[in-house]
């Protein structure tokens, strides 16, 4: 897809629209007309953006648009205010109706309650007067000047005092523990710590009455203690499947065999090589070169090293065998020496036995005692 493109003396390529007098023809240049058009468009946009006339027109348009936006916002605000006023009026009217209805209902209820109270009071008075008339006392001795019944007040106070007494003794209003901040927590904790009572298993044989069955131990936990007491006792995390890092990594030398007759492929090969990627072409050439070339000196040294190790091992084995033979010979010589010593000892013993004892002729005679 190569084409003849005109080239100027400058760095950038010239488009066919702006052809200058100095033109050079180069057949090895790719057709980048699309990129040239994009560059021209971007340059024209930059020039238009920094043109003063265009700036003034843009500022005017912005001012006009801002004024129009302000007018529209004011209209919207007025409409919203009118709507809120209407809604408030409707709410106020509904509230007034509700209040009127509620006041009427409340007044009716109060009237009914007053009538009921009057009827009950009349009944109480009638019963009291009947009792007084039957007992001979037509008048009420317990009424004050104001007409209040002292007996009713005393009875009312008696009931209230009894209620307070029960309330205090039931613990609902415990004044002693009122200023104890831990009272509520202690009572709640005590209720929670009570063991469950199983009445079915209450009468069991003797071997069933164990402490740990009816009352479970408070040290029984549902979690592993070692996990919290010694966090370092956990096993280490499993290693990932990533390959280990190569510390002594040495890249191979730059390939000396380049494709002949194809400069573009050679450029690509060098660019990919320097960027860290190896192409399939280089890998194929490397495989072919392995078949034709001599092995790498490192590989030769490696084999030599292995051969030397094997030879050294064989020599060591031979030396060990020789040492074992020498040890055996030494043992044999020691055995021979021991045998010779035994023979000498036997001879000396026999000689000592064959010797004659000396004759003691001058032994003094003892006197016989009567």
Swiss-Prot record:
Residues 72-122, 189-204, 306-354 have a biased composition (Low complexity). It is found in: Nucleus, Gem; Cytoplasm. The keyword Cytoplasm applies. Residues 1-21, 66-154, 189-218, 291-370 are annotated as: Disordered. InterPro entries: Smn1, SMN_C. May play an essential role in spliceosomal snRNP assembly in the cytoplasm and may be required for pre-mRNA splicing in the nucleus. This is Component of gems protein 1.
């Amino acid at each position: 897809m190569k084409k003849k493109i005109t080239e100027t003396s400058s760095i950038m390529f010239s488009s066919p629209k702006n052809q200058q007098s100095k033109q050079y023809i180069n057949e090895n240049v790719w057709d980048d007309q699309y990129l040239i058009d994009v560059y021209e468009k971007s340059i024209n946009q930059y020039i238009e953006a920094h043109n003063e006339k265009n700036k003034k027109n843009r500022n005017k348009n912005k001012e006009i648009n801002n004024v129009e936006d302000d007018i529209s916002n004011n209209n919207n605000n007025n409409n919203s205010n009118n709507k809120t006023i209407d809604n408030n009026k409707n709410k106020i009217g509904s509230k007034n109706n509700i209040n009127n209805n509620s006041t009427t209902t409340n007044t009716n209820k109060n009237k009914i309650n007053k009538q009921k109270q009057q009827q009950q009071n009349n009944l109480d008075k009638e019963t009291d007067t009947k009792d007084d008339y039957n007992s001979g006392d037509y008048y009420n001795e317990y009424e004050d000047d104001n007409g209040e019944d002292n007996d009713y007040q005393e009875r009312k106070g008696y009931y209230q005092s009894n209620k307070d007494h029960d309330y205090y003794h039931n613990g609902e209003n415990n004044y002693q523990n009122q200023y104890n901040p831990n009272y509520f927590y202690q009572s709640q904790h005590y209720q929670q710590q009570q063991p469950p009572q199983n009445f079915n298993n209450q009468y069991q044989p003797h071997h069933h009455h164990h402490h740990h069955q009816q009352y479970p131990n408070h040290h029984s936990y549902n979690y592993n203690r070692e996990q919290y007491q010694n966090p370092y006792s956990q096993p280490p995390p499993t290693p990932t499947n990533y390959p280990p890092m190569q510390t002594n990594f040495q890249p191979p030398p730059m390939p000396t065999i380049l494709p002949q007759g194809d400069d573009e492929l050679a450029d690509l090969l060098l660019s990919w090589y320097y960027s860290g990627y190896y192409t399939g072409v280089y890998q194929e050439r490397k495989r072919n070169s392995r078949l034709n070339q001599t092995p790498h000196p490192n590989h030769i040294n490696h084999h030599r090293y292995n051969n030397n190790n094997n030879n050294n091992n064989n020599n060591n084995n031979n030396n060990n065998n020789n040492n074992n033979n020498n040890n055996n010979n030494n043992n044999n010589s020691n055995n021979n020496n021991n045998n010779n010593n035994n023979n000498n000892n036997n001879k000396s013993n026999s000689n000592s036995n064959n010797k004659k004892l000396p004759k003691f002729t001058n032994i003094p005679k003892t006197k016989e005692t009567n």
